[in-house]
Amino acid sequence: MQNIGAPHFHPRRLLAAVLILELVSSLAGCASLGLRPGETAQTEAEESAKGLAYYHFLEAQQCLLEDDFAGAIREYEEVLKEDPNSARLELELAALYQRQGDIKKALAHVEKSLKLDPKQQEAYFLLAGLHVGLNQLEEAIQEYEQVLALDPDNREARLFLATLYAQQRRFPKAIQTIQSILRLEPDSVVGHYYLGRFFIETDQIEEAKQELQRTLTLDFNFVPAMFDLAVAFEREKQYNRALVMYHRVLRHQPNNTRAWANIGRVLLIQNHYGDAQRAFARVKSLEKGDPAAGFNIGIINLEQKLPDDAIREFRPLLSNPRYQERARYYIALALEEKGDLKAATREYQLVSRNSEQFIPARLRMAFLLYQQKEKDRARQVMDEMQKLAPNREEVYLTSSYFYEEENLWDQAINVLKEGMGKVENPEEIYFRLAVIYEKKQDRDESIAYIKKVLELEPDNPDAQNFLGYTYAEQGINLDEAERLIRAALKAKPNSGFIIDSLGWVYFKKGQYEKAVVELERAYHLMPQDGTVAEHLADTYLRLKRLPEALRLYRRATELENSNPTELRKKINELEFRLRGHSL
């Protein structure tokens, strides 16, 4: 939220003129009085003092013309000695002290000014601004309310009030206040703009778009409204419209780094890595090595499998306290990408315990230790993590993974069940338990745990597919299996796994023509998966397409997720049949 605060209170020539009038009036005060004979000496002394005050006042004005504010303060203080009850002089001094950064003296003078004359709107504005500078927002709000008590239609005070409410996250109050401005001035550009901003803050994106578009109708070149309208489009994932609006900002402000940075972010979301990198490079050049831009360029390099380039971007950020830990974490990821597991492990170990990256860094470190055959160290790290982060599901999932890799199903199950009662959202743990029980050939327990996932997340497509495929494998509840898998396919229409499951349900139902359509589609999406290839080969076999079946069985033996023993048996049987056909 942009803090516009109160207007900076500059010395004004109008105020100077008023002060001159006051001073001249006081100097001429005794001209019309009849003086008694004994009062002549006293009167001459007073006249001399007032003449001196007038001299200091003129000197103060000269200092202001020369922007010598410290000199003006000295001269005004001299004037104040002769005219201590001038509310306007106190106000002028308060403004000068504010300009010089002496908030304590500014407060003292403005408060004295208001004590002398409590109806000065300018003084309340200045006092409110001082309170904002001290982050005393409630006090500032009270001062603006005083302005409105004197002038209920004061739009400036209402606008500042609205921005203060927004700073306090009191957005309903901020919105009401801005709407009161628009009732007074329906075509207020600033009013519609801030209303749009506050709607964005409260996730009322449609209303925000309407207000910001209204702002641009009233002032086609109002750049802040363009920028925030782009943000609104981005929030709604209307990325192309957001890009159009950000580029419109750049037509007015070619070096607007926020617009370039947001363009880079949107392009990154759209996987347009080259264009995103160029946008962030522009930010980096404009901001003279902007760390955020360098960080984002590093991320893009990682996404593009350019680990050395990524490391070059991240290394300078190790000296930046804001980015240090994140940079170290991503340097470790880049080293992993390079295959330098030992160096990556060292970087993960250096991530500070107080950083957000500590837990993911430790989990990656344990995983790399396990890959490097340092299994005891890996488990030691995970034991430490279960004590440090007992509520994090990823800790238990990683620990169980190590046991799964060694087919130690019971140990994996025990770890997950320990975490099941500690994490807030155990869906992932339930899902993993279902998978492990499936591997353990305990399908009843597997089904029980996947149903727990669906109780918590009825529309979870992976859980729907898992249960549907499990039913299909067992040849039970095939209509329910088809319903579950079709529901999953709506959420993930291009998932090869789910398409394979649907084809396998058709196969189990004996609907081979329908099965082959889905399984060929799945195989096209996942040509390296042995299970999909085997399912398609089984279907070809049922359709008497024997040469195609044999070719695909042989191909499946070379793929991942295959059962070579079972495949060899099928190949031998089919080869025998084909030899018989050729006799």
Please tell me what each predicted stretch does.
Residues 30-92, 99-104, 108, 115, ...:
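N-terminal leader/linker segments that initiate helical-solenoid repeat arrays
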Residues 38, 476, 547-583:
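Terminal, low-structured helical/coil segments at or just beyond the last alpha-helical repeat
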Residues 46, 53, 87-88, 121-122, ...:
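Helix-start (N-cap) detector for alpha-helical repeat units in TPR-like alpha-solenoids
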Residues 48, 82, 116, 150, ...:
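Structural marker of alpha-solenoid helical repeat scaffolds
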Residues 64, 91, 98, 125, ...:
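Position-specific recognition of the canonical hydrophobic site in helix A of tetratricopeptide repeat
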Residues 66-77, 99-112, 132-146, 167-180, ...:
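Structural signature of tandem alpha-helical TPR/SEL1-like repeats
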